[in-house]
Amino acid sequence: MKRAEGAAFVATLGALLAMTAASNDIMVPAQPPIARAFGMPEAAGAAMVGMFSVGFGFGLAVWGPLSDRFGRLPPLYAAAAGYILAGAVCALTDSFGVLLAGRFVQGFMGGVGPTLARAISRDLGGGARTAQALSAATVVQGAAPVFAPLLASGLLVAADWRGIFWALVVFGLAVILSVMLFVPETLPPEKREAPSIRQMGRETRVLMVTPGFLYGTAMVMTVFFGYMALLGMGAAVTESAYGLPPEWFGPLFAVNSVAYVLGALAANRLAGRFGVSTIIRAGALTAGASGVFLLALSAVAPPLIVLWTGVVIYVFAFGTLLALCAARGLEPAGAVAGTAASIMGLAQTLFSAAGAFAAAGLFDGSHRSLCWVMGVSGVMLLVLWAKGRRYL
């Protein structure tokens, strides 16, 4: 009998959370080559991240309420099947427009993963148990940003960009199998509620005046805004400003991913000892320091290693803050965890898309757009924490 505990269960939650990271991080080294393959400018590669994020946001608005009505597993299976189909369309198309449409659908379907991973964690009872489950799953999720760019770089050398989308098809199949084997239904029928516009409106109004939810969501939104600028334009910046070939960006990005995993590990290990609020404070201070550093670098022409030091510090803070701020925001949600997770995820992904498009729009062939977007995000995280620290 499947039980909501154990390493396999946590690993599967991590895989669900990783549907976003796997789908976007694997694209990072390939964005400039894909753009060139379709005769597009390098900055157009950011649209692949942006369209996924927009679709992802709309998906989050759907999967949470559906899971509150029908349980966690039926929407999960349906969306995972759609995710696999969209990946196959992207792999087979010869049209950049169809590719972007496929990325939108892939994002829409992929929204089920983080939404239901968070809702399933909240079903465990809330409080420290939810925070620990999300933090542990986030550590597992960290494998995706470490290995996905390395896999993409290898596929670019051994084959071409289409192999990247076939890899996502295989990942989707693995997620479905893992859910079937290890994840039980955590929302029993007696606790399910039929979604309605009126009910969702009432729930949303309650959440919009709940400070803990608002500050937790704002922190998640802001930390993703800066991170998605890195995903959207990191490869283009290093190739254009520093001459780094796309196939070498995967190993460089893996350094960031290790920093993310270390940040998530620190949050998971230290939150129980020092308290969630203390670790969020440390993450906000780290993010603020990286933001000031990156904004200062925008005024000079730093070596790549100096620029990447600021980026790595930000990503470490990203790993530290993400799961704990999400858990803090969901803690007051109670029985409407699915709707709360959808609202949080929708806000997060729309800001994610905005971060990618902002970095692309500001791109002038130098490092400055990356520094501006990530730097402002880091400083804003510190400001948000200072204003809402009693709730975080």
Residue ranges and their predicted role:
Residues M1-K2, E185-T217:
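Juxtamembrane intracellular "pre-TM" segments in multi-pass secondary transporters
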Residues A8-E42, L230-A235:
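Extracytoplasmic
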Residues G39, G71, L92-V98, M109, ...:
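Helix-breaking motifs and short loop linkers at transmembrane-helix boundaries and internal kinks
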Residues F58-G97:
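Conserved MFS/SLC helix-loop-helix module at the cytosolic interface between two early adjacent transmembrane helices
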Residues G82, A86-V89, G97-Q106, I305-I313:
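Paired small-residue
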Residues V98, G127, S135-L181:
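Helix-loop-helix hairpin linking two adjacent transmembrane segments in secondary transporters
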Residues G102-A143:
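Cytoplasmic helix-loop-helix junction between adjacent transmembrane helices
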Residues T278-L324:
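C-terminal transmembrane helical hairpin of 12-TM major facilitator-type secondary transporters
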